[in-house]
């Protein structure tokens, strides 16, 4: 009994599988792709109407190849699944209701392309099916004439039948160019062909008979021709021999054969070639075979005739070479007088042509140089354009991968970046930054007299108020102290700039000074139990060292110095930092009174034995230390006032309960007051951290805690938000996944191109194509996914055959601990072998 084959298996060809892979809804999508590849009508279209569009394969192709903002409308009897940027209608194209729906959707628009891939329900009889298809095409043409713009395209499917020629004639009346084609995706056994009508004429009025199937497909009776009509009345002219040619045998010479313009025609008419020239007869190319062939040409075959043509070519070369040698000999035999006359004429001509040739040569050289420069400029422009396009492509890829925001690039750093303190290295760069653009100020000051020193009104008021408040002695002390400061600054500014060492950045202040860090480390070290006995001795040594430092600093302050004259250089004033000139008035007064001596010559600092003087000294030392600490050690070196760094605010990361409590506090003032009132309870203690044992504090925190008045739903909401935040991948992981996805997509596109090339190849069989496609997808890693294997640990005492455990689906593998140990041992052996080879 014969085996029955599958009915629809032969229909699953390469385009069926390609449609499955590329995501098209039907294999007919490739028909439209191939038609568009040939006629290029989708790229220029702004509006498209697809009749009989289900299931939507042609709509997918149109949405892919047309501009993004195009209008695409699809109509069919059956519903079409929605597509992005596509409008679908469920109507019958043969009814007036469909025309009204299209007018409502298109409004005043005219479409550029009308597609029709419709076919009736076939199966009754071939004649009936062909007529139904032609009638459907005529109705589609009627809709196309209503909505198609001038110069538009109409692509329709037609069956090859007796109604095909009338349809073609109607198309030719309405369109400028009509072409019938059958794309490669259309099956060979199918009777369908596609007619592409381009250049719609858009007549003002179309005869309704064109769209009437009774008139369009009416059979025209052809009158039969009689026998007398078939017989031609004029007798044709008799063709005989050439005039004067009475014989069939023609003998020609080899010279005529060499001079013939068409040697093939000459051989077809000649019967014999006689070699009458002795020199040509003795030529090495004239062999015995050639002589025999020349005796009877009519009996020669293709090979012998080709040898005669080659023989003719060799003889012609020989004769041409001989004629050149004879002409050369004739030129040499000219008389000497003629040669001399010729030389004189040539010399005169050369003298005339020399400047002209030189000018032409220079002009040619100049043109060549200009052309080279222009080519270099064009190449440079191309290189810059390519670089710009490459950067734009990279930026676009980064934006698509969400590595950058649109318009903001983290990777691209221009020449002018943001200001950074880390770029300032050394005092010179710092002065350039602080000075800024002072050209306008220098110009203004240069126009004024040199002797004037300008002080603002506010400074004048401060000075007058200070002079009125202080006694003469205190005022003298303040002036002496300010003179000392100015003299110290002048000595510092006179240091050579070349001796500056580029140290650390003066604007970057560390969180803690080195001395403070060293002191903290030392205190941690000496807080150990081994140093507990020598604590008193260390305190005494520290007090002695502090007293010595205090005494030395007071002696330096009490030394009288002659005040130098105040500086009048405007440039120095401009460079002087604000932190040194502006010292608090109270501090200057205190320091000044400490440094001034009595009129009798006795210093105030000598009475150190009394308690009052010692206390005053300590207070003044504290004030001076406070001033120095406020100005910092860098104030004298760099000319900037260093402000003490405040501790940054420590942000706490709140748990869900804390967030819910914060929401309650932020939403209601009354709830906030209630929370503050409830915080004073019996569970609240005022112990500082570290007073109680750690185990006791943890136990109290666990068991003696008051429940917060927050909603469970609110806490669960914030807990869910935390889970979502924690579930997000970090930026590097997201970028890596995006890069991996981009590589896979790129590899997939390359594989698709190769697969299309393999599919379009005609020389190989279908089996070889399938094998090549399978190997391509396997190399690209796009084959079948590895099936999931469930590992089941075997128990002792179970045989080789193990039943499927409960709850395990799919493929499973039985493993045991012995197998795992064996595999590890095998891996260790392989590792040892590798080390030995190295």
UniProtKB/Swiss-Prot annotation:
Location(s) in or outside the cell: Nucleus, Nucleolus
UniProt-listed Pfam families: DUF3381 (PF11861), FtsJ (PF01728), Spb1_C (PF07780)
Assigned keywords, A-Z: Citrullination, Coiled coil, Isopeptide bond, Methyltransferase, Nucleus, Phosphoprotein, Ribosome biogenesis, rRNA processing, S-adenosyl-L-methionine, Transferase, Ubl conjugation
Amino acid composition bias (Acidic residues), ranges on this chain: 336-348, 457-474
Top EC group: transferase
InterPro entries reported for this sequence: RNA_methyltr_RlmE, RNA_MeTrfase_FtsJ_dom, rRNA-MeTfrase_E, rRNA_MeTfrase_SPB1-like_C, rRNA_MeTfrase_Spb1_DUF3381, SAM-dependent_MTases_sf, SPB1-like
Residues the record lists as Citrulline modifications: 390, 774
Basic residues bias: start-end ranges: 802-812
Catalytic activity annotation: a ribonucleotide in rRNA + S-adenosyl-L-methionine = a 2'-O-methylribonucleotide in rRNA + S-adenosyl-L-homocysteine + H(+)
GO biological process: RNA methylation
Cross-link Glycyl lysine isopeptide (Lys-Gly) (interchain with G-Cter in SUMO2), sequence positions: 571, 634, 650, 669, 701
Subunit structure: Interacts with NIP7.
Family: Belongs to the class I-like SAM-binding methyltransferase superfamily. RNA methyltransferase RlmE family. SPB1 subfamily.
Protein name: pre-rRNA 2'-O-ribose RNA methyltransferase FTSJ3
């Amino acid at each position: 009994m014969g085996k029955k084959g599958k009915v629809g298996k032969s229909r699953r060809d390469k385009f069926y599988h390609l449609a499955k892979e590329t995501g098209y809804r039907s294999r007919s999508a490739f028909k439209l792709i191939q038609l568009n590849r040939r006629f290029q009508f989708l790229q220029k279209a702004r509006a498209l109407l697809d009749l009989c569009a289900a299931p939507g394969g042609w709509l997918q192709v149109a949405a892919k190849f047309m501009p993004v903002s195009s209008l695409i409308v699809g109509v069919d009897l059956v519903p079409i699944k929605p597509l992005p940027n596509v409008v679908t209608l469920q109507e019958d194209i043969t009814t007036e209701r469909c025309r009204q729906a299209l007018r409502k959707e298109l409004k005043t628009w005219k479409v550029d392309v009308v597609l029709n891939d419709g076919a009736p329900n076939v199966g009754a009889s071939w004649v009936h099916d062909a007529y139904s298809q032609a009638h459907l095409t005529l109705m589609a043409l009627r809709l196309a004439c209503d909505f198609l713009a001038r110069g538009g395209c109409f692509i329709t499917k037609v069956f090859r039948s007796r109604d095909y020629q009338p349809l073609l004639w109607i198309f030719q009346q309405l369109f400028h160019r009509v072409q019938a084609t059958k794309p490669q995706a259309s099956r060979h056994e199918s009777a369908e062909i596609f007619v592409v009508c381009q250049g719609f004429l858009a007549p003002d009025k179309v005869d309704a008979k064109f769209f009437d199937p009774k008139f369009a497909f009416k059979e025209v009776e052809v009158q039969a021709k009689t026998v007398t009509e078939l017989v031609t009345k004029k007798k044709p002219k008799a063709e005989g021999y050439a005039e004067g040619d009475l014989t069939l045998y023609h003998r020609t010479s080899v010279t005529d054969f060499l001079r013939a313009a068409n040697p093939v025609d000459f051989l077809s008419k000649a019967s014999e070639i006689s070699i009458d020239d002795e020199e040509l007869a003795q030529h090495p190319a004239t062999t015995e075979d050639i002589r025999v062939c020349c005796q009877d040409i009519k009996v020669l075959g293709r090979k012998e005739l080709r040898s005669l043509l080659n023989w003719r070519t060799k003889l012609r070369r020989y004769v041409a070479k001989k004629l050149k040698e004879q002409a050369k000999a004739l030129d040499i035999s000219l008389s000497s007088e003629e040669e001399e006359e010729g030389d004189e004429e040539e010399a005169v001509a050369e003298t005339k042509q020399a400047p002209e040739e030189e000018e032409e040569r220079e002009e040619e050289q100049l043109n060549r140089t200009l052309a080279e420069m222009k080519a270099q400029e064009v190449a440079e422009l191309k290189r810059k354009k390519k670089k710009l396009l490459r950067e734009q492509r990279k930026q676009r890829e980064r934006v698509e991968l969400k590595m950058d925001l649109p318009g903001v690039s983290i990777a691209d750093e221009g020449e002018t970046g943001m200001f950074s303190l880390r770029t300032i290295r050394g005092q010179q760069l710092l002065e350039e930054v602080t000075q800024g653009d002072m050209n306008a100020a220098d110009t203004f000051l240069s126009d004024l007299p040199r002797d004037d020193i300008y002080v603002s009104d506010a400074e004048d008021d401060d000075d007058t108020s200070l002079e009125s408040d202080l006694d003469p002695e205190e005022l003298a002390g303040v002036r002496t102290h300010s003179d000392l400061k100015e003299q110290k600054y002048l000595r510092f500014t006179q240091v050579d700039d070349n001796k500056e060492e580029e140290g650390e950045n003066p604007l970057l202040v560390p969180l803690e000074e080195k001395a403070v860090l060293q002191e903290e480390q030392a205190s941690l070290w000496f807080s150990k139990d081994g140093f507990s006995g020598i604590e008193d001795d260390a305190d005494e040594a520290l007090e002695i060292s502090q007293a010595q430092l205090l005494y030395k600093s007071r002696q330096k302050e009490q030394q009288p110095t002659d005040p130098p004259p105040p500086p009048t250089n405007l440039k120095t004033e401009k460079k002087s930092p604000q932190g040194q000139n502006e010292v608090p008035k109270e501090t200057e007064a205190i320091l000044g009174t400490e440094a001034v001596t009595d009129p009798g010559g006795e210093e105030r600092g000598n009475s150190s034995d009394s308690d009052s003087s010692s206390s005053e000294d300590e207070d003044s030392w504290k004030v001076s230390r406070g001033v120095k600490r406020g100005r910092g050690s860098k104030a004298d070196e760099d000319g900037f006032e260093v402000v003490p760094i405040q501790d940054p605010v420590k942000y706490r990361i709140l748990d869900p309960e804390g967030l819910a409590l914060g929401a309650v506090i932020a939403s209601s003032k009354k709830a906030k007051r209630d929370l503050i009132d409830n915080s004073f309870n019996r569970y609240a203690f005022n112990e500082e951290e570290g007073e109680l044992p750690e185990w006791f504090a943890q136990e109290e925190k666990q068991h003696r805690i008051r429940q917060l008045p927050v909603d469970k739903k609110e806490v669960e909401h914030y807990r869910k938000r935390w889970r979502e935040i924690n579930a997000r991948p970090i930026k590097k992981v997201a970028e890596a996944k995006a890069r991996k996805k981009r590589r896979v997509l790129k590899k997939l596109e390359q594989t698709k191109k190769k697969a299309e090339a393999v599919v379009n190849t005609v020389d190989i069989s279908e089996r070889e194509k399938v094998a090549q496609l399978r190997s391509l997808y396997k190399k690209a890693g796009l084959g079948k996914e590895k099936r999931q294997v469930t590992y089941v640990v075997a128990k002792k005492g179970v045989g080789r055959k193990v039943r499927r455990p409960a709850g395990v689906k799919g493929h499973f593998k039985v493993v045991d601990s012995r197998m795992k140990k064996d595999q590890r041992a095998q891996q260790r052996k392989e590792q040892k072998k590798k080390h030995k080879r190295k």
